[in-house]
Amino acid sequence: MQKVVAIVGPTAVGKTSLAIEIAKKLDGEIVSGDSMQIYKEVAIGTAKASREEQAEVKHYLVDAHSVFEDFSVKNFVDEARSAIGEIAGKGKLPIIAGGTGFYVNALLNDMQLGDKEEEAASVDPEWEVFLAANGPQALWEELNKKDPEAAKKIPVANSRRSLRALSVISRTGGLFSKQQAEIKPRYDYLIIGLNSDREAIYQRINQRVDLMMEAGLLEEARFVYEHRAGEHQVLQAIGYKEFFPYFAGEASLETCVMALKTASRRYAKRQLTYFRNKLPVEWYDPLTDPNCANRIAVRIEEWMKEEK
């Protein structure tokens, strides 16, 4: 089974720089595990590796598509798998670096995924009718009756996930939670998580936002705002939608910058929750341990020798 390293963690913890350092130490190349870095029109708000950094180590799935293209998690997995194959074909180590937990999980594990049309087709019309007539709470309660374990992991408000779970139960006669538990690894992977003291992370987030503003984030956000017609994924990205009230004349720039800092801190918290609950992560603190990169490199080298 192909060995793959993933470097994950909350925003602003230093994943990009550490991934580059590890890639240089261990002859690796990097696949972005970020749902927004794929888009070529936006760079500042997505915190991509700089051109200089990308020149040091080859990156895949950065600037690969336009914001005006549909790009689903299934598309991501397909292209990332191709990139991993290309990297491995050179005899190099594939390194996934990014903070979009669901994307990383879907790549590393053989999860059932579909594009928007396939996903819509996978929903049982009977349950769609039930949702329309009774609402999200009643739909979730039906799921809770049939599969309490699945219901525990699905928020009441997330009707799309409740619909999918109920549809799977109806079609297979089995528990959705059991089928989810049977997801099999696609690779032999090691997941390195970066984290530090919460206040230190929050301070780095605030500093990053200030630096992004100096680098031209407002104009990038204006581009997104001016092209907001349609259902482009980038419209929902943290770093852009927070400025929409400013462009609409409904809020001051200072208020929007503060909103971005708050949203980024909340996002960091959600990222950590996902990684802790969904993936087997080995955690390191790059902010307080000056030898962190070396320790991680040694751990990866040890793991590379293990048979599976």
From Swiss-Prot:
It catalyses: adenosine(37) in tRNA + dimethylallyl diphosphate = N(6)-dimethylallyladenosine(37) in tRNA + diphosphate. InterPro entries: Dimethylallyltransferase, IPT, P-loop_NTPase. Its EC number is 2.5.1.75. Substrate binds at T11, A12, V13, G14, K15, T16. One of its GO terms (molecular function) is tRNA dimethylallyltransferase activity. Pfam families: IPPT (PF01715). ATP binds at G9, P10, T11, A12, V13, G14, K15, T16. Keywords: ATP-binding, Magnesium, Nucleotide-binding, Transferase, tRNA processing. One of its GO terms (biological process) is tRNA modification. Residues 34-37 are annotated as: Interaction with substrate tRNA. Its cofactor is Mg(2+). It is an enzyme of class 2 (transferase). The keyword Iron does not apply. The keyword Transmembrane does not apply. The record marks T100 as: Interaction with substrate tRNA. Monomer. Catalyzes the transfer of a dimethylallyl group onto the adenine at position 37 in tRNAs that read codons beginning with uridine, leading to the formation of N6-(dimethylallyl)adenosine (i(6)A). Belongs to the IPP transferase family. This is tRNA dimethylallyltransferase. It comes from Lactobacillus delbrueckii subsp. bulgaricus (strain ATCC BAA-365 / Lb-18). The lineage of its organism: Bacteria, Bacillati, Bacillota, Bacilli, Lactobacillales.
